[in-house]
Amino acid sequence: MYLENCIVILTSTTPPWWAIPPAWSLGAEIQAYFLLPILLTYKMLGLSVFWISYIIYSLANLNIIHSDYFGYRLIPGVIFMFLSGAYLQKIVSGKASRLEMLSLIIIYIISLFWLVFFIIIKGKYGAYTRETLLGLLVGIPLVYTLLKIRRKFYFNDLFGKLSYGIFLSHFLSFWILEFVNLTQNIISMIFLSLIISASVSYLIITLIENKVEKIRYNLTR
């Protein structure tokens, strides 16, 4: 009776009752943060999950299973991405095992082949295959390079805080622009939605996040 009120069954990627469509990612992140300590503590379990997750992601991108759910939204098909970031950190700090390093390199090579052969040549892909593969192929070397540089750039913290707020509020910016009828030009729409999303994110940081961080810091002193 009470459990059904706490569970959302995902039957649509754009449900009419969803005020913040990207909020599904919070669920995936919470699950990942529960799983990561276990998967990183037990290395062989982590590597097994890493490969199983990538296989699920691949099956989704071939449209064998639901490409949107299992290749983009739900934890079984994306936990390998979280593990990729963790393995990058371990590689840079010299704590990664040879199997962890090799697995990350192999998956990167497979993903590069996938992009060239299946997407560019064959034109075969599922929902968000292009976006997630491109993010993976650009993100892994970029994050590795930034971790190796170990240099703190100006505005790093601010941009880091803004990024997730922009992601969560970008639909709001689309709806505002649609309401005021400013969606005719795609370039101006992208520019304006970025400004609106960044402004909303900055307000949330200033009015809520910074105050919560201050309270949290005082509690842990």
From Swiss-Prot:
This is Uncharacterized protein aq_1078. The chain crosses the membrane at residues 33-55, 70-92, 99-121, 125-147, 154-176, 186-208. The keyword Flavoprotein does not apply. Keywords: Cell membrane, Membrane, Transmembrane, Transmembrane helix. One of its GO terms (cellular component) is plasma membrane. It comes from Aquifex aeolicus (strain VF5). It is a multi-pass membrane protein. One of its GO terms (molecular function) is acyltransferase activity, transferring groups other than amino-acyl groups. Pfam families: Acyl_transf_3. InterPro entries: Acyl_transf_3_dom. It is found in: Cell membrane. It comes from the Bacteria.
